[in-house]
Amino acid sequence: MAGPFSRLLSARPGLRLLALAGAGSLTAGILLRPESVGAAAAERRRLYPPSAEYPDLRKHNNCMASHLTPAVYARLCDKTTPTGWTLDQCIQTGVDNPGHPFIKTVGMVAGDEETYEVFAELFDPVIQERHNGYDPRTMKHTTDLDASKIRSGYFDERYVLSSRVRTGRSIRGLSLPPACTRAERREVERVVVDALSGLKGDLAGRYYRLSEMTEAEQQQLIDDHFLFDKPVSPLLTAAGMARDWPDARGIWHNNEKSFLIWVNEEDHTRVISMEKGGNMKRVFERFCRGLKEVEKLIQERGWEFMWNERLGYILTCPSNLGTGLRAGVHIKLPLLSKDNRFPKILENLRLQKRGTGGVDTAATGSVFDISNLDRLGKSEVELVQLVIDGVNYLIDCERRLERGQDIRIPPPLVHSKH
């Protein structure tokens, strides 16, 4: 890619250098020898056939396990990406974590942008299952950040406690969190924080490093749902994303804490717009405006986000490809949540239920985190509208149950072909 940004350069066969030009001076340091790493792994594996290395997935319930046949494993197990990332590293989190009480997890992660190409034979069918039939081999993803297209984005606040829209973005040229070195992780932090310093007006704010916070300060931000949790999730730890914690991790937020950027958790960045109450339209308007400004500031400094027309924005987990967008609400549903039709209603509306505190938590006081299930194949505007329409349907069901009336399961939404 053209431009004075940090990138991996081949200095001589077998050696990779990190050229740091974005800071105004050139600094070079040896990162790794991915070719030798991959060669050593392949040589060791040749002592045993792929069938001897194939993981035991008989009790697993994740997308990876559904598609990783012995034949696919045999064809991919000796391949590596240019940075040395392997198939076994992709799938380890799904091998170690067979299933999840609330959702069917993906069970695999990417280590770099090239992962999705090198291991496409496994990733493509997983993506197709996870994203409601989206076929990355034949379809193209669309982006739309025009918040003026949103209709009726105001929820009844007797039910909806807070509204939030988030996405992720990855810096091209640097490995993703499961694979990044300490130097790459620190470079992500430097690039992002430098760009965010250019935000103005109601988006202006400051960056807070985890390493400079007290335990009490961290916990308060977590309890208030502003900060990501400590790296206790087995999905996170098994994928290698908790290494060196809390080095080069942090949170940036504006003065009102309504626009936030997480740095170096599951992704290089998570961009979040949130506020209490049910004004999803205002939350999405701020999200679109802030995200466009962040991307402009990143590009002005010679960097860019990982993106391609098949998969949209590239992130660590295949579940977040495309828009990377999760529009959600904290909503009280004491009656509907006890109805045995609730899971099927969510499924047909393409909505996902999480616990009050996120993916690895339970619901507290019948309050659920409800958000869009899909990220890929629909635009940001389409997904936010889907959530608005779906949440209003859930509220209508709750009201009907309050009045002693019956509810019905809506017909399933069909994936549009792009």
Curated annotation (Swiss-Prot):
Q: PTM Phosphothreonine: list the residues.
A: T214, T356
Spell out the reaction equation it catalyses: creatine + ATP = N-phosphocreatine + ADP + H(+)
Instruction: Give the location in the cell.
Output: Mitochondrion inner membrane
Q: How does it sit in the membrane?
A: Peripheral membrane protein
The transit peptide of this chain lies at: 1-39
Q: Which Pfam families did the record assign?
A: ATP-gua_Ptrans, ATP-gua_PtransN
Q: What is its EC number?
A: 2.7.3.2
User: Which residues are annotated as modified residue Phosphoserine in the UniProt record?
Assistant: S152, S197, S233, S366
Q: Which GO terms describe its molecular function?
A: ATP binding; creatine kinase activity
User: Which GO BP annotation is one of this protein's?
Assistant: phosphocreatine biosynthetic process
Provide the residue span(s) of the region labelled Cardiolipin-binding: 40-64
Query: What name is this protein filed under?
Result: Creatine kinase U-type, mitochondrial
| Organism of this sequence | Mus musculus (Mouse)
